[in-house]
Amino acid sequence: TVVDLSKATVFPTHFTLNYGLYALFLKQTKCGDLRYGRQMYDYQEGTVTSFAPGQVVEVKLNDGVRPMSHGILFHPDLIRGTSLGQEIKHYSFFSYASNEALHLSDDEKKIFQDCLDKVQQELSRPIDKHSKRLIARNIELLLDYCMRFYERQFVTRSKVNKDVLMKFEDLLDVYFQSEQSPNEKLPTVKYFADKVNLSSNYFGDLIKKETGKTAQEYIQGKIINIAKERILASEKTVSEIAYELGFQYPQHFTRIFKKVVGCTPTEYRVIQV
């Protein structure tokens, strides 16, 4: 269904929604706070918020502020057996991990509304054998545009993104700078995302956009480079180096090293010498 929340007649000020549907809303005003999972949802006027089945959203409306937003809600059953049903998992803005809203330009808002209008037009027609497919395709068109806007958001925030990448590099250096204090575990994408105040999903998309590598691949590459330095610059055993880097089991370190470098750490030491 296509909805216009400005036409609502009842405005509870504090409630929790357990979504059994997919939902996208273009917010025309910030009417209060949204808690999405365990985090606050970053949204302002002119942004798109998105939710998926099974997700829980806590809403606190500001007194005297009417919700002003247009959007669409659709049940998973609507897209089963369609191309959208197969692709829905690739729209990363539906993830719980993505708590950053999509910020739209004026032209993008018009495109968003046009897609809603197309869905509404189809919903207003008598149902026939083409209805489900056409509705699903128009929803898919809307989601594809949102993915384009989402990627555009990375481009227009390029300077900010590069600052995040530099901060990521610094954090990696700090994490591994001390050989005297072995790390208790390998660093995770979430660890670094939290450090730069981004969700893991958004941080991962940003790093992928800037480097061509996933955040996990980038971390792994850093670990391998540091491992190479320590293998050649010291007489420490492979096990000692593995523990310093945060590997619980040396054989895990050896397996990853060989996969990336093409030889074991011991073989690498012999070859380089």
Predicted feature residues:
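A short, Lys/Arg-enriched amphipathic alpha-helix from helix-turn-helix/homeodomain DNA-binding modules
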Residues: 158-196, 217-236
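A hydrophobic/aromatic-rich effector-binding and dimerization subdomain
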Residues: 62-127
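Short acidic-glycine-tyrosine-enriched beta hairpin
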Residues: 38-50
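Generic protein-terminus/edge-of-domain signal
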Residues: 1-41
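Terminal helix-turn-helix DNA-binding modules in bacterial transcription factors
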Residues: 209-248, 270-273
